A protein has these predicted regions:
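Short, Lys/Arg-rich, polar N-terminal cytosolic tail immediately upstream
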Residues: 1-7
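A structural signal for multi-pass alpha-helical bundles of membrane permease subunits
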Residues: 8-292
Length: 292
């Protein structure tokens, strides 16, 4: 007769089975199909030619393609700069909202609003703001002659949209620190920097790390805000990896090479996800050690 623990274990797998099957259908099968396509010269256009296996040729071409490498460098720049600024602004705003002042709750709601907006709405709003004819910041748009400025405009929209996520996670961590600790530190003559280093930073480092890794993954695969605002232009200056894969697959109809680009990008995202899991497990171990 099965023990109670084994019965519960089996029942848990039975309950999880529908979700696991759905995940396989929605994730594993398309991923396997994309992997297969990446080894072929499949074209979406009706050329009438049979599909041939080219094996690693698509990957070798991708690694030597200057346009792909430029898109990767552009994506890396977008990710690093955007996430760094979002982290800095998010922490500063969280520290502000953790203070006691009149209207704090109203300000908290206003801070969350950009994050609550759908990305498409946010992108369209910034596109209208940068319109050269009637945009509220058209003076800035007139300076977008240098192509690099367009990427910075997209980064501004992305930062405004996503820094509230960092603020929320850091603010939740700050509220777990008892006010008595800060009061006692002030009585002992500790400076604001020493209080931050001794109490604030240890409390927020875990949630901040998780927020930054999640934002890094999201920023690395940015697509929608670029599609709405710039369509990868001008002169491909805002063409990131996701947009590059989109164009290769659906604009140029090169399904085989597009799949190879997509698999390489998925591998890069997998590395970031592994980093997130590593930080999550390390934070959990620290919590267990602190409780012990």
């Amino acid at each position: 007769m099965l023990s109670l623990q084994r019965r519960e274990h089996r029942q848990a797998w039975v309950l999880l089975a529908p979700m696991l099957i759905a995940m396989f259908i929605l994730t594993a099968w398309p991923l396997a199909r994309t992997l297969w396509l990446s080894f072929t010269d499949t074209a979406l256009a009706g050329s009438g030619e049979a599909t041939h296996y080219v094996w690693l040729d698509n990957y070798l071409y991708a690694l030597t393609d200057p346009d792909f490498r430029a898109a990767f460098a552009r994506t890396l720049y977008f990710t690093v700069v955007s996430v760094a600024i979002e982290g800095a602004i998010g922490v500063l705003v969280a520290l502000l909202l953790n203070q006691r002042f009149v209207g704090r709750n109203v300000l908290r709601v206003l801070v969350i609003l950009p994050w609550a907006l759908p990305t498409i709405v946010n992108a369209m709003m910034w596109r209208l703001n940068f319109n050269p004819d009637y945009g509220s910041v058209n003076a800035l748009l007139s300076q977008l002659g240098p192509p690099d400025s367009a990427l910075h405009a997209v980064m501004l929209a992305d930062i405004w949209k996503n820094y509230p996520l960092v603020t929320l996670l850091v603010l939740a961590a700050l509220q777990s620190v008892p006010d008595d600790l800060y009061g006692a530190a002030r009585l002992d003559g500790a400076s604001a920097w020493r209080r931050f280093r001794a109490f604030t930073f240890p409390a927020i480092v875990g949630p901040l790390g998780v927020a930054l890794v999640l934002r890094t993954i999201d920023a690395f695969k940015v697509f929608d805000i670029i599609y709405v605002m710039t369509r990868g232009g001008p002169l491909d200056s805002t063409k990131t990896l996701s947009f590059f894969v989109y164009q290769e697959s659906f604009s140029y109809l090169h399904a085989g090479s597009g799949a190879a680009y997509a698999m390489l990008m998925s591998l890069m995202c997998a590395v970031l996800i592994a980093l997130y899991l590593f930080l999550l497990l390390r934070q959990r171990r620290r919590s267990i050690d602190d409780e012990a």
